[in-house]
């Protein structure tokens, strides 16, 4: 099931393919006689859409013998920017490794020596879960990934705004930039907000700053990385194992 009706409608119109929304999927589960329900959100974090998913599940919980909801990709949020966890560590390692390989380097250090900074652009949110982006930067720092920076389209948290990230990358002395989405799917935001030709895209803003010799993009979502897929499966298994 998809949580975003606008995407469901778009796929229906474009491909004539029907995808359930949460209520439709839950209705089918009830009609099919499902007793023990396990829900695996494929969201990045505990944000607004995750809350909507939980509300939908809550309305149906009395129609199942048991309902278990697994963690989204980045796991528990935690209280402040300093809080990290094993999920964030795994995502940081897996995403960075994939970006480094795609950029043609043998290691992150080799890319650093060549003056390359990697900028991972998330969506951003006014939801309290926005601290997750700050935590991901903390995680990168703790891993010693000095040339990895976290940004967001919405600029929430404030330090993840495009102009702030440009400033941070330039001040750190990097002359080449690789932009890649910190999103499960590389859709409109990756293709347009990050890599688009409009002057307000991240690609255009990084180039317009005049601070970098090259700015490249990698348009690929987290969901295409095998290790990330495995992490979702592990979250599902953990939920199923709960007593």
Residues of each region from the PLM?
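Active-site-proximal alpha-helix that buttresses catalytic centers in soluble enzyme cores
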Residues: 1-243
């Amino acid at each position: 099931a998809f949580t975003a009706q606008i995407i469901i409608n778009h796929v229906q119109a474009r491909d004539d393919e029907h995808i359930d929304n949460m209520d439709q999927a839950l209705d089918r589960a009830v009609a099919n006689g499902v007793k023990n329900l396990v829900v695996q959100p494929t969201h990045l974090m505990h944000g607004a859409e995750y809350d909507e998913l939980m509300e939908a599940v809550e309305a149906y919980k009395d129609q199942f013998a048991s309902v278990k909801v697994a963690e989204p990709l980045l796991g528990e949020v935690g209280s402040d920017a300093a809080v990290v966890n094993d999920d964030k560590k795994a995502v940081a390692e897996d995403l960075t490794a994939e970006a480094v390989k795609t950029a043609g380097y043998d290691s992150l250090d080799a890319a650093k020596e060549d003056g390359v900074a990697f900028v991972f652009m998330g969506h951003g949110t006014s939801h309290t879960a926005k601290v997750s982006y700050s935590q991901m930067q903390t995680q990168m720092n703790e891993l010693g990934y000095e040339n990895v920076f976290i940004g967001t389209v919405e600029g929430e948290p404030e330090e993840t705004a495009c102009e702030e990230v440009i400033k941070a990358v330039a001040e750190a002395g990097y002359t080449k930039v690789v932009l890649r989405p910190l999103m499960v799917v590389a859709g409109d935001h990756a293709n347009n907000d990050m890599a688009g030709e409009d002057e307000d895209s991240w690609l255009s803003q990084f180039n317009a700053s005049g601070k970098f010799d090259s700015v490249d993009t990698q348009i690929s979502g987290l969901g295409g990385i095998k290790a990330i897929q495995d992490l979702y499966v592990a979250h599902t298994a953990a939920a199923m194992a709960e007593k």
